[in-house]
């Protein structure tokens, strides 16, 4: 497996929190925090893929690399595929890691962990999950659950993803973390597929891959990164990063 390439899709047109990549957290735009965490993961070069000059400028001011992509992509995966061809047209990287641009508190170690399942040649896409401990999250449709079976230490093979409380019965429930490591060929296949029936019903694009027979494995991690989607999330991220600076 070649050194992975980390790509961070970032766009300003978020519905619930417009311009969130540029939101100030401890004096630094959020996208810069995410870029720094990705660099600290130490698994390969990091590039921000954006449709906005302002985002590219703040990354380049930090000495990072940003590429401009089309503004009309239907999903972050499509933006990822375009950025990959811009950054690496010769195919030197056969793995691409998609780190969402709204995870300013993410632990670099779990970014590094995301590629581990790809050591198995049967795995097409790798991702992350964490055990759900808070009872209210078990029935929360905004907390996506992964249903899978154990295939190795702290590793599941995904059988389904759902917004419902599942699976039934005794045992842990797992919160899916939307960070993906794709084999390059798997990403190209994925973005070429039409939307799947379950994908449209659950509004979860990873179901497209499962419906097409692709294999997704997930590493179980301890740290659940905070996704910033609302003003309340932004305030929580500011608090968490302020505490880290004090420590």
UniProtKB/Swiss-Prot annotation:
The terms under GO molecular function for this entry are:
3-deoxy-manno-octulosonate cytidylyltransferase activity
Entry keyword set = Cytoplasm, Lipopolysaccharide biosynthesis, Nucleotidyltransferase, Transferase
Which pathway does it serve?
Nucleotide-sugar biosynthesis; CMP-3-deoxy-D-manno-octulosonate biosynthesis; CMP-3-deoxy-D-manno-octulosonate from 3-deoxy-D-manno-octulosonate and CTP: step 1/1; Bacterial outer membrane biogenesis; lipopolysaccharide biosynthesis
Domain of life of the organism encoding this protein: Bacteria
Q: Which reaction(s) are listed as its catalytic activity? A: 3-deoxy-alpha-D-manno-oct-2-ulosonate + CTP = CMP-3-deoxy-beta-D-manno-octulosonate + diphosphate
A single GO CC term for this protein reads: cytosol
Major localization class = cytoplasm
* Top enzyme class: transferase
Position of the signal peptide: none
What EC number(s) does its UniProt record assign? 2.7.7.38
User: Which Gene3D superfamilies does this one have?
Assistant: Spore Coat Polysaccharide Biosynthesis Protein SpsA, Chain A (3.90.550.10)
Disulfide partners: none
**GO biological process per UniProt:** CMP-keto-3-deoxy-D-manno-octulosonic acid biosynthetic process; lipopolysaccharide biosynthetic process
Q: Where in the cell is it found?
A: Cytoplasm
Q: What does this protein do?
A: Activates KDO (a required 8-carbon sugar) for incorporation into bacterial lipopolysaccharide in Gram-negative bacteria.
Concerning its family, UniProt says: Belongs to the KdsB family.
Protein name stated in the entry: 3-deoxy-manno-octulosonate cytidylyltransferase
Q: Which organism is it from?
A: Methylorubrum extorquens (strain PA1)
């Amino acid at each position: 497996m070649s050194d992975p390439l980390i790509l961070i899709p970032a766009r300003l047109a978020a519905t619930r929190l417009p311009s969130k990549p540029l939101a100030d957290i401890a004096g630094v735009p959020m996208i810069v925090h995410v870029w720094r965490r990705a660099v600290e993961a130490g698994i390969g070069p990091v590039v921000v893929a954006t449709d906005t000059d302002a985002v590219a400028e703040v990354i380049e001011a930090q000495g990072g690399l940003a590429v401009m992509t089309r503004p009309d992509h239907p999903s972050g995966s499509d933006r990822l595929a375009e950025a990959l061809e811009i950054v690496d047209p010769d195919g030197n990287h056969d793995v691409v890691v998609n780190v969402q641009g709204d995870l300013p508190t993410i632990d670099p170690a779990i970014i590094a962990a995301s590629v581990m399942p790809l050591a198995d040649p049967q795995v097409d896409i790798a991702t992350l999950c964490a055990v759900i401990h808070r009872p209210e999250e078990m029935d929360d449709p905004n907390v996506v659950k992964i249903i899978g079976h154990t295939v190795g230490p702290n590793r599941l093979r995904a059988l389904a993803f759902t917004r419902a409380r599942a699976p039934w019965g005794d045992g842990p429930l797992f919160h899916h973390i939307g960070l993906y490591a794709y084999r390059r060929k798997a990403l190209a296949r994925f973005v070429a597929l039409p939307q799947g029936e379950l994908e449209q019903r659950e509004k979860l694009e990873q179901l497209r891959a499962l419906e097409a027979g692709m294999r997704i494995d997930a590493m179980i991690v301890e740290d659940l990164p905070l996704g910033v989607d609302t003003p309340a999330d932004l305030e929580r991220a500011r608090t968490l990063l302020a505490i880290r600076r004090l420590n």
